[in-house]
Structure formats: C-alpha cells, structure tokens
Design a protein with these regions (language model features):
Chain B
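Conserved catalytic network of the ASCE P-loop NTPase/AAA+ motor domain
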Residues: 49, 58-61, 81-86, 112-116, ...
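Switch II (G3) loop of P-loop NTPases
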Residues: 59-77
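Inter-motif core of Ras-like GTPase G domains
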Residues: 75-98, 111-115
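Conserved C-terminal guanine-recognition region of P-loop GTPase G domains, centered on the G4
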Residues: 94-147
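Conserved G1/Walker A P-loop phosphate-binding module
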Residues: 1-46, 55-58, 64-66
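A structural signal for isolated positions on well-ordered beta-strands in alpha/beta enzyme cores
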Residues: 7, 121-122, 150-152
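Canonical P-loop GTPase G-domain recognition
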Residues: 128-180
C-alpha cells in the first residue's frame, strides 16, 4: 500500500515525522504537480484546492528505519565533486577536473570518494559532512514546497552506487520547522491555544535533541495545568512565536497536546461542554451482546 | 424505555451515512439534499447530509440505541453540539484514501472532545481503496498519541467492520468505567 498524497494537504514536515515515528524504510518521491483543471474538496465540504496529478519526479529521498540516508533533487547537482565544491572542500577547477575524470572512468560516487581520500584531497569526514549538508539542504528546500504530489514506496532502496549517510530526522524537523514557519499555516495546525502540553511518554525521545533558548523557556512551563496561551504570556511571546515553538516540539515528538487539567480561560468562540449521559454497566453490556448478534446483509 | 445514543462524525464524504445504513435496523432517516450538479462536491457524491442521519438498534423492550450521523459540511456545524448532547461516545470516521481531509478530521475530533469527554474511536474508513493509508499511519497523521484511543480499520458498507467499530467503542466505555 503506497502512501500517496499532496503537499498542499500533508506537508513535507508531516511526512518526515510520519516516516521517523514509524521507522520506515523506502523512498519518497515528490513529483511535479500537473494541473487537471479540476478542483479537490477538503474535508470541511467547502474549501476547494486545485487538483494536481503527478508529473515528472522532481526529488527523491530514501530512508532506512526512519533515518534519512539519501536525497537528490533535479535542480541540485548531486555529483560528489559538485557537492564537495559547494561545501568548500574543492575549488571550481579541482571539481571540474575530478568530475571529468570520474565520468571518463565511469566511477561511482563510492569509488570516487575512495580515490579522493587515498589522494589526500579530502578526508572521510569531509565527504560525510559535505553529503550531510547537501542532503539537509534538499530537505529544507522541500519544506518550502506547497502543492506537489508525493508517493512513498515501502522498501524501495537508494541507488547502490551512491554514498548513504544516515541522518536523524528529528533535528532536521525542528530546524526545518523554524525555516518554514508561516503564521497562517501554524494557526491551522494549532487552532486552539487553550490546550495544554505534556511531555512525551518515552524519555529516550529527548536524547540528542538540541533546543534553542526560547524552546527551553517554553519547556520549563510545560505542565498539563498550563494552557499554551498561559505559557506564551509567561514567556512574553506572541501567539505566532508560541505556535512556532509548540509546533516544532510536537513535530519532534517531544510533547503531546492535552486538555488542560485546570480549565483555561475560554475564548469566546469555544462552546461549553454539553451534559454527559453516564450509562450504567448493565446497559453497555446489553448493547455489546446485541451488537454481536447483528448480521444484517447490507 | 431507556434510550442511549452514539454519534458518528467525521469530515465531508467520510462514510458516516453509509456506516449507519449498514447497521441500522430501520431505513436511515436521512436529511440528505442533492448537491448542485456542477459543484466540486458533486465529484465526490451526489447528496450530502444537511442536518443529521438517524439510525436505530433495538436491544430489547427496555433499551434502544440511537445512532446519529453529523453533517459533514462545516456550514452545518451548528448541529454538532446539539447532536453531541448526552452521547455515550462517538466514532470519528476518516476517509483513509483522502489525506486532504485529515486536518478536518483532527479538528472535528478536538471539537467533539471539547463538547464532552466521552470515549471515542477513530474508524479508518475505505480500507478497500487502493490509495488508503494504513491505520498506523493515520494515527500519526491525525496526531493521536494516546495509544488507548483505538484506531480501527473500517469499510462502512461491510457489517463486520461496522459491528467491530461499535463494539470497540462500547469496550472503551467499559474500560473507562473500570478506570473510574
């Protein structure tokens, strides 16, 4: 079952989060969006967006057990010589000559890397860091894409000739989220600032996570008794600033949104809870017995 | 005679009416209206619920379960609060093959949780569709971090699935009683 969709309704960050949390292995391809002239209805039954179908592939990411291992984008030269040049490890002339030679000898990236290390042009660390930088820059670019169709193929592997550098997605998600913050999008993601936050159940999710000063300030106030609005006030942040930080923490799986234990001050548009009908156990058991026996032909 | 009620909610065209039709012992009392032929909605389906759907399951002479389906279109959301009043629990239907409706599904879920903190389950509908997302992916997409919340595969036209979804909701209600 392929995971298909459109970045207009399921963003790159959300996709990376899904792949990270479910520890997927496979390839994610982003396609050019080809207009169909038709509209697509969103779940509210009134908002319409352009319906696009997949055209030519524009970018591809590969994952292994939830880690990003490879990225290529049509608009970014992914040859190892170019990657090393962009990260300042080779000059333009060196890059051009090495590329020419590698192409003449039909060398793979792996073979070329070995030759460059043996010739003391670069170190293994230089190569890994340069590829990481290239990969991450592709992901950050993808995070700004807003409407392209995508497809995730389970088990699909990266080209064998390429150098795979595993990258933890959580820090990318946090950094990428900082880059792509847009007020409107954030309001859609976190419509209700009267919700509270609590830390994720699994404390191991905090390992290797780097937080900024503002994020630490917010983290200090995380408690199911404090609404997001109250945290923003305590930290002297605007709604957008707090949304930015909470969104990043949510996407990285560090916190969860919960109803506040002590009711936060209501916004005027929040409706009052309706009375609850408390059933007794006998009623529920009788319902279960009845429903188990229903065998109606549709 | 005691009556109890459950609410079937979810985004536009997620399969709420079909779900109730599949298990109700009576012909569903529906308030469906035709969608304008040229509209985008009409590409999805020809009719939409404007007030509610109503189904019934008679347990015995003393007990009846009513199933209320909410209108999917936001412009009829004034009905939601009315329908939520006194519910035992609710089912959030999601069309697993339409990621464009996931955000709305999450918003509806949060709204109903705000109306009443009753147990609920999420039905990952249209699992027979080629493009359907798996329930475990939907859990992440809908940000349902609480593993106690059941996210169940569903095909709203198939009685087996519908029965299972309602049973799981009832089990959740029992579990909540136990925990209290």
């Amino acid at each position: 079952m392929a995971l298909k969709g459109n970045l207009a309704v399921f963003t790159t960050t959300q996709l990376l989060n899904l792949i990270n949390l479910s520890k997927r292995s496979g390839s994610l391809t982003i396609f050019e969006g080809v207009e169909t002239g038709e509209k697509m209805m969103l779940g509210d039954g009134r908002t319409q967006i352009d319906k696009l179908v997949a055209g030519k592939p524009l970018a591809r990411l590969n994952f292994r057990e939830g880690k990003l291992v490879f990225a290529e984008m049509q608009s970014k030269d992914g040859h190892l010589a170019s990657i090393l040049q962009r990260s300042g490890k080779l000059n333009e002339e060196q890059s051009r000559l090495i590329r020419q030679r590698a192409e003449a000898l039909k060398m793979s990236d792996k073979g070329l890397a070995l030759s460059l290390i043996n010739a003391n042009y670069v170190t293994q660390k230089d190569i890994i860091q340069s590829i990481q930088k290239h990969t991450v820059s592709i992901v950050f670019d993808l995070m700004t894409w807003k409407r392209e169709p995508f497809e995730f193929k389970e088990g699909d592997q990266a080209p064998a000739s390429r150098i795979l550098v595993p990258i933890d997605l959580r820090n990318i998600i946090i950094e990428g989220t900082r880059i792509q913050n847009e007020q409107l999008e954030l309001e859609k993601e976190i419509p209700n600032l009267d919700m509270a936050l609590r830390f994720a159940e699994d404390p191991s999710s905090f390992k290797n996570i780097k937080l900024g000063a503002n994020e630490w300030r917010v983290v200090g106030f995380i408690n199911p008794k404090n609404s997001i609005r109250q945290i923003a006030k305590a930290c002297n942040m605007t709604d957008t600033e707090i949304r930015r930080i909470v969104y990043a923490l949510l996407q990285a799986g560090l916190v969860q949104m919960v109803k506040p234990q002590v009711e936060a001050k209501r916004r005027p548009d929040i409706r009052h809870p309706v009375p609850r009908n408390t059933p007794d156990r006998d009623v529920v058991n009788r319902l279960i017995t009845k429903i188990k026996t229903i065998n109606k032909t549709p | 005679m005691q009556t109890v009620k459950m609410v079937i909610t979810g985004p536009f065209s997620s399969g709420k009416t079909e779900f109730i039709k599949t298990i109700s012992e009576i012909d569903v009392v529906s308030t469906e209206r035709s969608i304008t032929p040229d509209s985008v909605e009409s590409q999805e389906k020809s009719e939409t619920t404007v007030a509610m759907d109503f189904g019934r399951i008679t347990v015995d002479n003393d007990l009846v379960l009513y199933l209320f389906g909410t209108p999917g279109q936001r412009r009829f959301d004034f009905m939601w609060e009315i329908l939520a009043e006194g519910m035992l629990g609710f089912v959030v239907m999601v069309d697993s093959s339409k990621p464009e409706t996931f955000r709305e599904a999450r918003s509806i879920l949060e709204t109903f949780r705000a109306y009443a903190p009753t147990p609920y389950v999420v039905a990952a509908n249209k699992q027979d569709h080629a493009d359907a997302w798996k329930p475990e992916d939907l859990r992440i997409a809908l940000r349902i971090e609480d593993e106690n919340v059941k996210l169940l595969p569903c095909i709203a036209t198939d009685i087996e699935y519908v029965r299972e979804v309602l049973l799981e909701l009832l089990y959740s209600i029992l579990e909540e009683m136990d925990s209290n």
